[in-house]
Amino acid sequence: MQRRTFLQGLAAAGALTGLPFSFAHAMTQTGSVSVESLPKLEGDLTLYLGRGEGGLYENVLKAIEKRNPKLNLKVRRGGSAALANTIVAETKAGVKRADLFWAVDTGSIGVVTDAGAAKPLPDDLRSQLREDFQYPSWSPVTGRVRTLPYNTERVKPEQIPESVMALADSDLKIGWAPAYSSFQSFVTAMRILEGDKATKAWLKGINKHAKKYAGELGVVMGVERGEVDIGFANHYYTLRLKSGKPNANVALAYSKGDAGCLVNASGIVALSDGDLPVNFIRYLLSHEVQSYLAREAYEIPLVQGVEPPQGLADLSTLSPPEMDLRKLADLRPTLNLMREVGVL
């Protein structure tokens, strides 16, 4: 969808605008709610925004502002981890400068919720989300899944093990981006699930037959060019590549029940009481915003009833590990381990 079309669509006033939210929600059968049925946003609101995907989060904010002219939205931008630490420091000092925190990763969300800065969210808002993504003090916005992009001319699907741990002992040439934050979160999940000893051995094994890239788009492009057989990357890099090159020699494989199929999420936390912060979150969970981020950013909608990006397996068919995503907050042991092995 073109940016202008999205802004106009979200800003357009509809016949349902004046309905109370509870009534509008009852009219919705799929779980997703149209912005036309949401209450207007009025007043001052400060949002701390972690860096989003290619400015698309900024487009969402502009659309919300255009639809709600009486909303005075102030945005502070920065890295999610740095903003989370700022919120914790402000909370300890008894200073409140932010009403909302929208982060690109759950680790940063965990830092804020563990500090006691998050306000509880109402049941009707949480019930819009998939059952496995409903939390009392924060709301996921969109998801991303760890995948194994592979070259379809060099690798057959049956050559790819179901366990990501088994790749350390395979003959496949592997592409990875150890300095990339999402990869480090993936290794953190592996540490939590498998232990430091097994993770250290895995890093050593992979490093023997891996090619290093600066980022995970580079990994996927390297796979497609045949520089490597298989790689580690978030799902959307492959979908973006294939959207511009439908016949690209790359497809997605998924491991089962381990960190290689981890589903992470961007999320938002209400830091102030009252209806305004909560109603702002409702806009992010609206059918229009969820569909926009699925189409343009290839992110996974976590609200029930919204179509996932084309080319991605349905979440219900995947086997991600069961874990508290907020535990991914502390990367320091992971970075120390990666430096010890020599991959950083």
Show the residue positions of the predicted features.
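Periplasmic-binding protein-like
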Residues: 128-131, 144, 174-179, 203-206, 212-213, 284-306, ...
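An extracytoplasmic/periplasmic, membrane-proximal ligand-sensing/linker region
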Residues: 301-344
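Extracytoplasmic ligand-binding site segments that recognize negatively charged/polar headgroups
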Residues: 41, 46, 50-58, 78-81, ...
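A bilobed periplasmic-binding-protein/Venus flytrap-type ligand-binding module shared by bacterial periplasmic
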Residues: 147-154, 191-192, 262-276, 284, ...
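Short, polar/charged alpha-helical segment
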Residues: 31-46, 50-72
